[in-house]
């Protein structure tokens, strides 16, 4: 059954993204280089896993879709996390509308089309060369496979290949990626999740490709090869807006105007997102006046789980961390070095402060 596939494969794919969170974080240069894309995607997926695992055995795909929608909305962190939540919602709702016990190629294509519809609706100003581009490209590939009367297995395999090829094209679409010599972090995170999910379905749980996540200034594309050192441009002038502000919102009125309030958020900053359905929403915006944003929304309902962080400071910390790693790599050879496996950026920072020479991103599967 489709429900069993999602229930069994989703946690495995989420764990792979968690294991690669630090690697994804290092690629994070857009929209601001605050180094948290992998962490935010992992936290969002992790909340969904908890919701799915809380369901009774034999839960339907409709039940699982509701759990994915609710879990991803409640747990969404950061710009990447909120967009990921909408991708998951759209695809899950699409799968829930499938009629048969097994997903057909048409079901897969339809679910991805719905994912594109929901995710792009949530973002006022979609940017090419990001996670949304990869989503659209794999959806287009699924449509092509449906027209070619491909089997579901052939379609899934083709989607994985297209996901990484789309990631490899991101530096050609978004100049800041080319300038920094990397692919888009969110795009790579989504491709990783897709491959990990398909591999779990194919009986290869926890396996993903080695993907070269760097590009050179002459235009050589990223490719499936071996992950090499990431050369990050440390010079960043800063964003016009300093504070990443996000919170959950419960509207007081059934007439809450989503469009008008999204327009207000846009007037206060950028990367504005207002997702969900009345009365419960997730709100995200980069702004210089989080106080005004919160006050505005308090007049329209209740707010909770407020999270405000200074992106300038995060970018500085990320730059310093990269600089320290470079200095350690280029320094004189030591008679004895320490290598540690860290399950996440928080542990990596602690180990680095203790003098560990090399940090390897990993988790429970290592």
What residue spans do the PLM features occupy?
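N-terminal loops that bind phosphate or other acidic moieties
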Residues: 1-366
């Amino acid at each position: 059954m489709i429900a069993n596939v999602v229930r069994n494969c989703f946690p495995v794919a989420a764990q792979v993204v968690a294991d690669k969170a630090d690697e994804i974080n290092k690629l994070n240069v857009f929209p601001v280089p605050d180094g948290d894309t992998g962490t935010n995607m992992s936290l969002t997926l992790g909340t969904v896993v908890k919701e799915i695992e809380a369901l009774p055995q034999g839960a339907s795909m409709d039940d699982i879709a509701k759990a994915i929608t609710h879990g991803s909305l409640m747990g969404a962190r950061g710009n990447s996390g909120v967009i990921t939540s909408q991708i998951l919602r759209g695809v899950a709702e699409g799968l829930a509308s499938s009629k048969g016990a097994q997903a057909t190629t048409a079901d897969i294509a339809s679910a991805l089309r719905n994912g594109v519809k929901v995710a792009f609706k949530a973002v006022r100003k979609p940017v090419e060369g990001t996670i949304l581009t990869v989503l659209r490209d794999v959806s287009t590939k699924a449509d092509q496979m449906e027209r070619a009367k491909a089997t579901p297995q052939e379609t899934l395999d083709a989607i994985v290949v297209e996901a990484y090829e789309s990631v490899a094209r991101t530096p050609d679409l978004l100049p800041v990626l080319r300038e920094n010599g990397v692919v888009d972090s969110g795009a790579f995170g989504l491709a990783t999740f897709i491959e990990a999910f398909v591999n779990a379905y194919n009986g290869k749980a926890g396996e993903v490709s080695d993907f070269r996540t760097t590009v050179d200034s002459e235009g050589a594309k990223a490719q499936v090869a071996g992950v090499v050192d990431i050369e990050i441009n440390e010079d960043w002038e800063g964003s016009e807006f300093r504070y990443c502000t996000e919170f959950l919102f419960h509207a007081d009125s059934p007439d809450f105007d989503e469009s008008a309030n999204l327009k207000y958020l846009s007037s206060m900053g950028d990367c504005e997102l207002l997702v969900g359905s009345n009365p419960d929403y997730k709100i995200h915006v980069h702004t210089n006046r989080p106080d005004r944003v919160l006050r505005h929304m308090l007049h329209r309902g209740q707010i909770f789980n407020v999270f405000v962080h200074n992106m300038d400071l995060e970018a500085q910390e990320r730059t310093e961390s990269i600089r320290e790693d470079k200095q350690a790599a280029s320094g004189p050879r030591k008679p004895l070095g320490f290598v540690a496996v860290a399950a996440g950026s928080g542990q990596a920072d602690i180990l680095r402060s203790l003098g560990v020479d090399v940090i390897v991103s990993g988790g429970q599967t290592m």
